[in-house]
Amino acid sequence: MAKKSSIEKNNRRKRMTGNAAAKRARLKTIIADKTKPMEERFAATLKLAEMPRNSSATRIRNRCELTGRPRSNYRKTKLSRIALRDLGSRGLVPGLVKSSW
């Protein structure tokens, strides 16, 4: 089980990303638009740099929904390999069958 503070920190980052996504996208389009004057694009760059780092989507870590484990996660199920194997062996994941040949 991961530390509760790490899980909560990641949840806070998810919330901040959701709140600031529209503003961040608007600033990025201004920066990328070459038809706008250089001063306006530079001002947008400064505003983007002033925004909190945790409002960026790249700061979010994929974690297991059950255990909070940060590594070896399957995106489709949002579970770590350990949790997926445990739930799969108990028959709690639909469509997952233990392999035998």
Curated annotation (Swiss-Prot):
Gene3D superfamilies: 1.10.287.1480. InterPro entries: Ribosomal_uS14, Ribosomal_uS14_bac/plastid. Residues 1-10 have a biased composition (Basic and acidic residues). The keyword Ribonucleoprotein applies. It comes from the Bacteria. GO terms for biological process: translation. GO terms for cellular component: cytoplasm; small ribosomal subunit. GO terms for molecular function: rRNA binding; structural constituent of ribosome. Residues 1-23 are annotated as: Disordered. Keywords: Ribonucleoprotein, Ribosomal protein, RNA-binding, rRNA-binding. Part of the 30S ribosomal subunit. Contacts proteins S3 and S10. HAMAP family: Ribosomal_uS14_1. Belongs to the universal ribosomal protein uS14 family. Binds 16S rRNA, required for the assembly of 30S particles and may also be responsible for determining the conformation of the 16S rRNA at the A site. PANTHER family: 30S RIBOSOMAL PROTEIN S14 (PTHR19836), SMALL RIBOSOMAL SUBUNIT PROTEIN US14M (PTHR19836:SF19). This is Small ribosomal subunit protein uS14. It comes from Nitrobacter hamburgensis (strain DSM 10229 / NCIMB 13809 / X14).
